[in-house]
Amino acid sequence: MRALVYERYGPPDQVLRLADVPRPEPGADEVLVRVHAASVNLWDWDQLAGTPLGRVLGPFKPRHKVLGADIAGVVEAVGEGVTAFRPGDPVFGDLSDGKWGGFAEYAVAKTGELARMPDGLGFIDAAAIPQAGALALQGLRRRPSLGAASAVLLNGAGGGVGTFALQMAKALQAHVTVVDRGEKRQALLALGADRFIDYREADFTADGQQYDLIVDVVAQHSPGRFAASLKDGGELVVIGGRIPTLLQVAALGGFVGRRRRQRLGLLIYKPSPADNLELAQRCAAGTLRPIIDGVYPLARGAEALARIGSGLAIGKVMISVAE
């Protein structure tokens, strides 16, 4: 089978290659999926480029030679003891708790990583959902009282997580401020954002505005600056960002906002087929939609990874595997 393979860290055009590799076989409680589509996440980029976060799984060389966690496809075969799925079932899911390997014609998944695709949902849209959509959903759930009177800020709003979170927050009638580079202004306003801030022109922690909830995908501010931008009782949910910021929020977030009943913390992502299915059903019903920046064939996978690494993508970057 064909797969995008890499054996050392570096730029995608230098280390990523399309190769013929043996097709994996499903073991007990596993399913072999013929991959139709896969999405590219920042976590793929981090592992490919060998950023400090990306080297957590492999300090000196890549742990997973074939990246790709979010997939959609059709069950080709099932392993021993599998009763939840059978060949021919359309499925999707996040393989990041298992073997990865989604940037290939076939991938092995644990049954607990997959859900059936709802009727009316295509493979590209299904593969776009898992990590980005579930992160957005889990982040907003930290503030169950969100509603028409709520002020929300999304930092790094133009990527996969942010474009999902923006739609979900607007569905709850919240007032949503988004922060990203100016090139994404029109797309985010068209998606429903009430206010746009270009981070290259203004610092959202310095304008005096305060929010009930801040969801930050690219956190770079100190806990004190975050706290000043939250209302009394407000909450900060950090999904990603610079390692020093992540460490500061993890260590100090529980103390910094205590006087004003604020909560500052990191979101510990939990891959969830149930969350993925809920989001997929919303997409199939037309109340939510994955924003697709572009679709690349498997042979141009290096371009897809480079697009994510550039920071210019609006929404999800996708790889179409099955022709």
Model-identified regions with their sequence ranges:
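Mid-domain Rossmann-like dinucleotide-binding core that forms the NAD(H)/NADP(H) cofactor-binding site
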Residues: 127-198
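NAD(P)H dinucleotide-binding glycine-rich loop of Rossmann-like/cofactor-binding domains
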Residues: 61, 69-70, 77, 84, ...
